[in-house]
């Protein structure tokens, strides 16, 4: 699918190894507010390159403030309430339901962990990752 013709891409300048400057994030929040209002963009549709193309993209980096964006209405985040996945919880299906391309499960897991766990060191889901994934999955149902 040609995502570029039906999306708006925003590039932020960052070397990939440090947090984004506050002024840059403040400007981004202002721009996103305008775009959301003008185009009626749903909250869940604010995503990163790696979320839509996990096999080809690895940005934004782990320092990107996804939680802060979510607090302003841009993108989904999870709450801190305990949630234990059901015994029949299927992590790969959950990744697919929340929007990840799971044809390459390792890439999908890596992108999920970069976005929601700020982790790129491991490529498997641990119990904490599965709990977060379960919380997000429940929001999509």
Regions found by a protein language model. Give the residues of each.
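Short coil-to-beta-strand
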Residues: 1-9
């Amino acid at each position: 699918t040609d995502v570029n013709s039906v999306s708006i891409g925003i590039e932020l300048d960052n070397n990939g190894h440090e947090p984004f400057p506050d002024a840059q994030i403040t400007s981004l929040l202002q721009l996103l507010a305008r775009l959301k209002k003008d185009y009626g963009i749903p909250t869940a549709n604010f995503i990163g390159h790696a979320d839509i193309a996990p096999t080809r993209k690895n940005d934004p980096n782990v320092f990107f403030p996804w939680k802060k964006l979510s607090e302003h209405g841009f993108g989904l985040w999870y709450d801190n309430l305990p949630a234990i996945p059901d015994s029949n919880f299927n992590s790969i299906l959950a990744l697919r339901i929340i929007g990840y391309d799971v044809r390459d499960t390792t890439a999908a897991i890596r992108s999920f962990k970069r976005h929601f766990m700020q982790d790129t060191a491991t490529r498997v889901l641990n119990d904490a990752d599965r709990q977060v994934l379960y919380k997000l999955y429940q929001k999509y149902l």
